[in-house]
């Protein structure tokens, strides 16, 4: 009989004493509360510099899983780019310089697209502002902005403030015009809803979609129709004569300034894959010799990379594999890349002895319509694996508290927490029945704050600490832990030596 050591990541499950707007506190969760009271527990920091982000920056799933899997603080793309701007290296970046040289020589346009907010999860508008300043410095005349509106990592109705900030930089530099506006629901889909991506592509390339004289007018009209930032229809900004300010054409260059890959891949593929088949792009398929991605998005995206990946050696998955242990990664679609690619330090391939189980997320418009998502199917599949004695190490993600938490709606999020708790109980009982040990934690908060103090929906992640429980009564845990300390703790429990690259410290005293 194998005695599995399982890491259970309750995505978006933060801890906060205040119960107002706190779906985690208001939900009935007898299993979690029981384990918290019965077993050694502590809290971990999952935001800011503890996970390689700027101070005070909320954590997110990509960052959380990278830090957990690496067993160290992993300096994030946001921090890397910020430092490059601060130290003057950003403007010297060869990939940016090559794109600028190309448009200057050919007299073509430079298009900047990405998520326009200061959420810092997928992008940061300061990086786009740095690109505007660089373009101005280098004498690029035609610079067009294709703004993806957020409303998810920031407040749901905040787009206007980011448009205003952009207009200030346009005024300061003398370059840049808004060309298209679209909500991230369309431009940043990651679930193969290609009909959404197609609307965005057609606006950018063909000038198809609702037309407005300004970005401000687009947002105002959307709000008047009850459509907020995330869901704004891909729209085209037009000149006085109703012609598009700009479309993307042959020999133009693109800099896609999102730094997080998962929601950038699909739209990038439409522009970079010659044999793209997910939808018919129509007669006009612009040839873009310089398509620049801020970071490495995927092998499926044929673009240049401005900030190339940093190699993360000896992640938990690799160390476990080298020790000859069998490991399982399991999640539903929305969090599958997190327990595989991100947890393995940005590696797509499996390690020897690694098995992966993907359970499809339900096809609903938004997850508040189905707060349980596919958690029961994930749980059934995992309990079956545990009972069959197949794995020494299990990495599980329950997506609900995060994905439903993003709705900013209390009732569905409470249901999500309660479904998570029910399934947590089933998984932990199966592990304990095999004399195994479960480590229960989260990658960041979300469901712990669903309402602002004004009673408005709070759709973003939080900076609250996350739980850490070890279902083993003969250990003592220290305070001040961070996500990067989880892997060393697991290795302690497994009796496997911690490699020098893992600079985290075990939480077991």
Curated annotation (Swiss-Prot):
Pathway: Carbohydrate degradation; glycolysis; pyruvate from D-glyceraldehyde 3-phosphate: step 3/5. Its EC number is 5.4.2.12. Its cofactor is Mn(2+). The active site is at residue 61. Substrate binds at residues 122, 152-153, 184, 190, 260-263, 335. Pfam families: iPGM_N (PF06415), Metalloenzyme (PF01676). It is an enzyme of class 5 (isomerase). One of its GO terms (molecular function) is manganese ion binding. Belongs to the BPG-independent phosphoglycerate mutase family. This is 2,3-bisphosphoglycerate-independent phosphoglycerate mutase. It comes from Bacillus cereus (strain ATCC 14579 / DSM 31 / CCUG 7414 / JCM 2152 / NBRC 15305 / NCIMB 9373 / NCTC 2599 / NRRL B-3711). The lineage of its organism: Bacteria, Bacillati, Bacillota, Bacilli, Bacillales. The gene is gpmI.
